[in-house]
Amino acid sequence: MLRFAPSPTGDMRTEQLRIAIFNYIVAKQKEVNFIVRIEDTDKERNITGKDTEILQILEKFAITHDSVFHQSEHLNIHQTLAIRLLEEGKAFVCTCTPEAPESDKTPSRYNGKCFNVDKEELKRLKEEKIPFVIRLKKPEHDMIIHDLYKGETVTSADEVDSFVILRADATPTENFASACDDMLSGIDFIIRSEEHLDETAKQEYVKKQLGYEEETTYAHLPVILNEEGQKMDEKDDAFTVKWLFEEGYIPDAIANYLISLGNTTPTDIFTLPEAIEWFNITKLSGSPVKFNIEELRLLNRKHLEKMDDKRLSSLFGFADADIGKLAKLYINEAATINELDARIKAIFSPKDFDGKWGEQMRMLEKIIAEAPMFATFEAFESHLMKESGLSGEYFSKPLRVLLTGAEQGPELSDIYPYIKSYLLEVAS
């Protein structure tokens, strides 16, 4: 079983979406369940509504899940497992302040002050309401983790240390909650960012101390870099999926690009369902990959070009295949929904009759309003020229502005078939 485990602490990052896609693909390939676990145990950082946004984004990409739950729903289970470790002598109560463990010469290591707190002392702490945490006793041996990309990694017992598993407010730490939930859900394949590699030894140790013996396959993906070769962060436009949507990039293109990053694909243009047929998680590059917005623009253009005409028209508020075909006439100069939408809006918006060609435009507007519908542009153009007496650029330029709202663009003979039934609205 595989899982995607985001935290509702901000907008979904582009890198997180890539991880979700890979987990979903591998789950489909293995014909096992794929679950979404909202890791909301850090109450102070949670942002209301972000969990819903995450699920809505997954839905836009047709990433379906077999179940979804919030980690906070398992609070009682986490507490019970922590108490069990305490009772088995595998964990201990600690009353040290956050600063106390840092008082020795190795601030990142726990100093062992509370190793020998007994049951009587624990009873006193509860009665006197003295805050305490529960720590897992550090391992006796180094932890060895096997990763698809990093190979064998060794984490010393000192690095794992005696870490906190239950906070003073009785909520679990992220490492403890994640390990417990992975164990309870039977997660045996974990695909996530290499930023979590250092946490893996602790999470494996938790499962081991709880008696869980099932093997877990790990694939810690390299981070995504910006075009300057630095790790992407909030300063980078493409850091969040929300920004990509706002800029007019569509799910098919985004998924196509994220799957292609650091990968050799059999074809440049593909959909998520198609990728499931050939994707190989072991073939991804183990090195960081750069995000190139121009490459995404190219893919977005290609996917818009392939999109069903009527569906494309719906992105601009229509339900007419002709409007989709009209939009595709602009595909060479527009790569996003926003850019295409601007062209369509220019065609259907009221025109400016106060500009250079205003007088001629008013003349043509009146003729069009009184003219019959012509099947071809040639017949339409001939009628307008005859009735207006205009010719040359005094005819062609005002006609183009009247019909498209712009002085340049595709041939009017190509545009006309798709707007002829809207002429009274367009030419006004």
Swiss-Prot record:
It catalyses: tRNA(Glu) + L-glutamate + ATP = L-glutamyl-tRNA(Glu) + AMP + diphosphate. This is Glutamate--tRNA ligase 2. Its EC number is 6.1.1.17. It comes from Sulfurovum sp. (strain NBC37-1). Keywords: Aminoacyl-tRNA synthetase, ATP-binding, Cytoplasm, Ligase, Nucleotide-binding, Protein biosynthesis. It is an enzyme of class 6 (ligase). One of its GO terms (molecular function) is ATP binding. Monomer. Pfam families: tRNA-synt_1c (PF00749). Catalyzes the attachment of glutamate to tRNA(Glu) in a two-step reaction: glutamate is first activated by ATP to form Glu-AMP and then transferred to the acceptor end of tRNA(Glu). Belongs to the class-I aminoacyl-tRNA synthetase family. Glutamate--tRNA ligase type 1 subfamily.
